From Swiss-Prot:
Signal peptide feature range: 1-30
PANTHER family referenced in this protein's UniProt entry, alphabetically: EMILIN ELASTIN MICROFIBRIL INTERFACE-LOCATED PROTEIN ELASTIN MICROFIBRIL INTERFACER, PROTEIN HP-25 HOMOLOG 2
Biological role stated in the UniProt entry: Plasma proteins HP-20, HP-25, HP-27 and HP-55 form a 140 kDa complex via disulfide bonds in the plasma and are hibernation specific.
Tissue specificity remark: Plasma; synthesized in the liver.
Protein known as: Hibernation-associated plasma protein HP-27
CC terms in the record's Gene Ontology section: collagen trimer; extracellular region
One of the protein's GO biological processes: hibernation
Domain Collagen-like: 43-81
Pfam families: C1q, Collagen
Lineage, highest ranks first: Eukaryota, Metazoa, Chordata, Craniata, Vertebrata
Span of domain C1q: 85-215
Pro residues composition bias: residue spans: 44-63
């Protein structure tokens, strides 16, 4: 009997709490309907969803600033060594105040105006080619009261001949030739008059030559 009374008392208390909770819920719902904004209050953050598919690539951005210069690289390998052929040079200019007393003899020049390479032999009056190539030779002779006749010779062959006679005054002759010479070819100026024609008057001669370009 005591247990039945205790159970009835417990059921009565539980009923009271259920009734109070129902009233409270009714009040809350009534307030919510009167103030709809209260329903917009966000709830707690849910768990992350699944990753979506990749998007389309974006447009390239503007160029960035230039970076700092890098460190010097290691030395490269040595280059190839090539032996360069130096350009040949040859030039002379010589002067004489007389012609040889016998014909068909080279004119002996006593003074070298220029012969830095030493290719002209003053003792023989002969130029010996040291560098194969194209050369220019020229001569100028002034004669006073005498006849002059000379030839430009190459290896014993006449290239050109000039002559003049100044019996009572002054005469001038000159000549220029372009010659292709090989190594050791010889060029000189040769007298073509006899001793009788050379006995009177005076003469002054200048003979020159230079390399235009080598072969």
């Amino acid at each position: 009997m005591y247990e039945a009374g205790k159970r009835a008392s417990f059921m009565g208390g539980a009923g009271i709490w259920i009734l109070a909770l129902s009233v409270l819920m009714h009040v809350v719902c009534s307030e919510t309907q009167g103030n709809p904004e209260s329903c917009n209050v966000p709830g707690p953050q849910g768990p992350p969803g699944m990753r979506g598919p990749p998007g389309t690539p974006g447009k390239p951005g503007p160029p960035g600033w230039n970076g700092f210069p890098g460190l010097p690289g290691p030395p490269g390998p040595p280059g190839m060594t090539v032996n360069c052929h130096s350009k040949g040079t040859s030039a002379f200019a010589v002067k004489a105040n007389e012609l040889p007393p016998a014909p068909s003899q080279p004119v002996i020049f006593k003074e070298a105006l220029h012969d830095a390479q030493g290719h002209f032999d003053l003792a023989t009056g002969v130029f010996t080619c040291p560098v194969p190539g194209l050369y220019q030779f020229g001569f100028h002779i002034e004669a006073v009261q005498r006849a002059v006749k000379v030839s430009l010779m190459r290896n014993g062959t006449q290239v050109m001949e000039r002559e003049a006679e100044a019996q009572d005054g002054y005469e001038h002759i000159s000549g220029t030739a372009i010659l292709q010479l090989g190594m050791e070819d010889r060029v000189w100026l040769e007298n073509k008059l006899s001793q009788t024609d050379l006995e009177r008057g005076t003469v002054q001669a200048v003979f020159s030559g230079f390399l235009i370009h080598e072969n």
